[in-house]
């Protein structure tokens, strides 16, 4: 039965009974040329106190690519001509998230070394300790590489507990 199914599948694929796959973005057009987008732009609501905010928003969106429904689409396939759509904001997000994590880790290590009232200092952050750490956090990628290469970033095998199952 499995061989029969495989034979039927091979025949269907051989004679192209499978639907053709469309290239990514093949049905996308510049929003400035999309009739559905133009209709949406005419009834754009203002989102701020600026009476022109809706119009300005749709002017910015008109540079993007729209689908047949008139909505802008992000192209996230790694092509550099669309880097401003997704690649640059995602790298910036990862940098900021890493900064926050690195600074939080450094703060916890610092208060743990001081030894007194650690749990309370986790809840109520002490600004004299936290501010210098926050300001030095911009260089977290270099500090992370340095700590990784020195072995300070990772735990030693002896420090990792093993479950006695």
Swiss-Prot record:
GO CC terms of this entry: photosystem I reaction center; plasma membrane-derived thylakoid membrane
Keywords noted in UniProt: Membrane, Photosynthesis, Photosystem I, Signal, Thylakoid, Transmembrane, Transmembrane helix
Residue ranges of the TM segments: 83-103
One Gene Ontology term from the biological process aspect of the record: photosynthesis
Subcellular location: Cellular thylakoid membrane
Location (main, coarse): membrane
Database matches in Pfam families: PSI_PsaF
Membrane topology: Single-pass membrane protein
Keyword Thylakoid: yes
Superkingdom classification of source: Bacteria
Transmembrane helix keyword on record: yes
Gene3D superfamilies: Photosystem I PsaF, reaction centre subunit III
InterPro entries per the UniProt record, alphabetical: PSI_PsaF, PSI_PsaF_sf
Signal peptide: 1-23
Role noted for this protein: Probably participates in efficiency of electron transfer from plastocyanin to P700 (or cytochrome c553 in algae and cyanobacteria). This plastocyanin-docking protein contributes to the specific association of plastocyanin to PSI.
Homology family: Belongs to the PsaF family.
Name of the featured protein: Photosystem I reaction center subunit III
Natural source organism: Mastigocladus laminosus
Lineage of the organism: Bacteria, Bacillati, Cyanobacteriota, Cyanophyceae, Nostocales
